[in-house]
């Protein structure tokens, strides 16, 4: 019976994402930063570095949010160390996760195709066959 292997980095990533989500939520409020949420965390094999991917509720202020998080990364790491029982807490590197924006754009394009309807696409195909 095969079992799925779980690597330590996967478990630590999930825990960091949960704990950091709460910490970041409070920090953006305290520092007056645009509201963000932690969407994913990738941790290096040696657990020394963590890429923290965040999404901003206001896309136009995403650069400001990431810049602010990078400035307070040391404070966030200290709070994360208090919340987690790790000997070494990874260094935090914040990145904007644009996958939500790309997904929304694709969704809008698909919706626009639905608005065009099948009549327009069939007349286009008829014109191409001529």
Swiss-Prot record:
UniProt xrefs under SUPFAM superfamilies: Ribosome-binding factor A, RbfA
InterPro entries cross-referenced by the UniProt entry: KH_dom-like_a/b, RbfA, RbfA_dom_sf, Ribosome-bd_factorA_CS
Gene Ontology BP, a term: maturation of SSU-rRNA
Organism of origin: Xanthomonas euvesicatoria pv. vesicatoria (strain 85-10)
Coarse class of the protein's main subcellular location: cytoplasm
Record's subunit section: Monomer. Binds 30S ribosomal subunits, but not 50S ribosomal subunits or 70S ribosomes.
Pfam families: RBFA
Protein name as annotated: Ribosome-binding factor A
């Amino acid at each position: 019976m095969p079992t799925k292997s779980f690597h330590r980095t996967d478990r630590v990533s999930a825990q960091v994402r949960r704990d950091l989500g709460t910490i970041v939520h409070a920090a953006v409020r305290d520092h007056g930063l645009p509201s963000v949420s932690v969407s994913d965390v990738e941790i290096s094999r040696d657990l020394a570095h963590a890429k923290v991917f965040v999404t901003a509720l206001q896309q136009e202020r995403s650069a400001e949010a990431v810049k602010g998080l990078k400035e307070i990364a040391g404070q966030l790491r200290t709070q994360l160390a208090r919340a987690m029982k790790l000997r070494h807490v990874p260094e935090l590197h914040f990145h904007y996760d644009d996958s939500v924006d790309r997904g929304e754009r694709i969704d809008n394009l698909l919706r626009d195709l639905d608005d065009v309807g099948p009549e327009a696409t069939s007349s286009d195909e008829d014109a191409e066959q001529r």
